[in-house]
Structures are given as C-alpha cells and as structure tokens.
C-alpha cells in the first residue's frame, strides 16, 4: 500500500487516473484506501438549472450522481440522496459566494465549488475546490500556455465547539500541469502535485468561514512558494546548467 501511494505521488497529474486504475486491478484489496487517499485532477459539470459549472469530486458524490452547490440537486437525479442539514446548507451557500470572490482575486477566473457535510464527531467537514484553466483558450487574462491546469483541493475538518473554541484541521493538495510550445524554446512540459496539512485552534466568535478562509489563504500561499522554489526553481537551475542563457555563453567565449 505504501509503495502504491508513493508511486501515485510521483506520477504526473495527467496520468494519475490511468495509474490508479492499474493499481486497483493489481491490489483490489486496497481499493477503498486508494480511492480515499488519492486525489485526481478535478472534473467539471454544468448545472442546467442555475446555468453555472460546478466541480466533481468524492465529497459531492452519491452513487453515480453529483450534487451541485448552486441548486443543491443531484445530477443525474437520485432518490434517497444525502444532503447537508439546513443550517449547514446555509453556511455552504455563503461559503460558495465568498470563495468565488477569493477565486477571482487570486486566480482571475476559473471555477470554484464548496461542499459541506456533517461528520460523526458533532462537527462538520468542508471541501473548497478551485480549477483554473491557464491555456490560451482558458478564462482570465493570464491564459498564455499551450496547456495548463491548476487544481486546488482544500479539506477542513472542524471539531465540535468547546469553550467558544474549535479545532480546525486543513489538508490542502495542489496539482499543477503546464505545457508550452513556441519556436524559441520548443515544447516543454512540467507537472506535479504537493500536499500539506495545518492544524489550528481558533475562536468561533469570528465565524467558521472567516477562520477557514484565513487558513486556506495562508496554506495556499505557502504551497505557491514551495511550487515556485521546488518545481520552477529546480527546473530553472537544471535548464540553465544544461543550456546556459545566450548572454552567459557570450560572456564566457573569448574574443577572436
């Protein structure tokens, strides 16, 4: 099981679904563990009633149907489906509106969805999702890649309130893939994923949404910095070692 998870962590996000299917056929006895611990690139579905897109994941799935955060209905329709309580649904609606603003400010477009449900410990769980298409045909002013995708998954477990305090456990996963293709540099692809966790005890007087928002903003900022330093920084270092920039080569060449 550990070897399978290690392999999936090293697979490019584009190939993770194929790799997961192969592992499920090889070790079916671990299928439930693999499906619960492995994050796949996010898919999108259109809610005809609201006219908005929403993100599909295991957290809004029941059987083969997915619940829209906009209409609170399953697509395709499903009888005896699971729904959040009225109080939690109200919080979910507010979270979707606020997170859409966060998405536009940080990503300049894309698709976001928030789902909430009760857990078995008198608390609740919230899942915040963002999918950004950074290709030339994508939304937003920064779509300049041949292909590009940023998938962010933030899952927060909120414990029961004790003395006006609550425990928050945030697990964030970022999956990134990009491809450039131009005459000067040729075709280049880069992809990977990173996961981190944060735990905090915060006062509920500020509100759950405020607390969760601050945690997501802080951890996502750290993940962005890690991606920039590890993925892009190391890649830049390797490329410059193998193929130094033209100005450096000219500086090293003796005059003839």
Swiss-Prot record:
InterPro entries: CapZ_alpha/beta, CapZ_alpha/beta_2, CAPZB, CAPZB_N, F-actin_capping_bsu_CS
Keyword Cell membrane belongs to the record: no
A GO biological process held by the record: actin filament capping
Annotated coiled-coil segments of the chain: none
Superkingdom assignment: Eukaryota
Key words, A-Z: Acetylation, Actin capping, Actin-binding, Cytoplasm, Cytoskeleton
Gene Ontology molecular-function annotations: actin binding
The keyword Kinase belongs to this UniProt entry's keyword annotation: no
Signal peptide positions (record): none
N-acetylmethionine modified-residue sites: 1
UniProt cross-references to PROSITE patterns, sorted A to Z: F_ACTIN_CAPPING_BETA
GO CC, any one term: cytoplasm
Subcellular localization: Cytoplasm, Cytoskeleton
Subunit relationships: Component of the F-actin capping complex, composed of a heterodimer of an alpha and a beta subunit.
Role, per record: F-actin-capping proteins bind in a Ca(2+)-independent manner to the fast growing ends of actin filaments (barbed end) thereby blocking the exchange of subunits at these ends. Unlike other capping proteins (such as gelsolin and severin), these proteins do not sever actin filaments.
Family: Belongs to the F-actin-capping protein beta subunit family.
Record-given protein name: F-actin-capping protein subunit beta
Species name: Arabidopsis thaliana (Mouse-ear cress)
């Amino acid at each position: 099981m550990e070897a399978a998870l290690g392999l999936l962590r090293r697979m490019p996000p584009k190939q993770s679904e194929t790799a997961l299917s192969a592992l499920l056929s090889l070790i079916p006895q671990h299928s439930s563990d693999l499906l619960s611990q492995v994050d796949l690139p996010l898919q999108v579905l259109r809610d005809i009633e609201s006219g908005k897109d929403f993100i599909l994941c295991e957290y809004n799935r029941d059987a083969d149907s997915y619940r829209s955060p906009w209409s609170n209905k399953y697509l395709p329709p499903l009888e005896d489906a699971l729904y959040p309580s009225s109080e939690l649904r109200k919080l979910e609606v507010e979270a979707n509106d606020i997170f859409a603003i966060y998405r536009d400010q940080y990503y300049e477009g894309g698709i976001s969805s928030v789902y909430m449900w009760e857990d078995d410990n008198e608390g609740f769980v919230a899942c915040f999702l963002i999918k950004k298409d950074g290709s030339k045909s994508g939304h937003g002013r920064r779509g300049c890649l041949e292909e590009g995708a940023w998938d962010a998954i933030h899952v927060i477990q909120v414990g029961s309130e004790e003395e006006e305090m609550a425990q928050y456990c945030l697990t964030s996963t970022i999956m990134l893939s990009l491809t450039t293709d131009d005459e000067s540099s040729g075709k280049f692809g880069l992809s990977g994923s990173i996961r981190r966790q944060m735990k905090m005890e915060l006062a509920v007087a500020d509100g759950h949404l405020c607390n969760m928002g601050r945690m997501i903003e802080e951890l996502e900022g750290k993940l962005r910095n890690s991606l920039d330093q590890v993925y892009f920084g190391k890649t830049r270092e390797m490329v410059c070692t193998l193929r130094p920039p033209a100005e450096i080569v000219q500086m090293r060449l003796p005059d003839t």
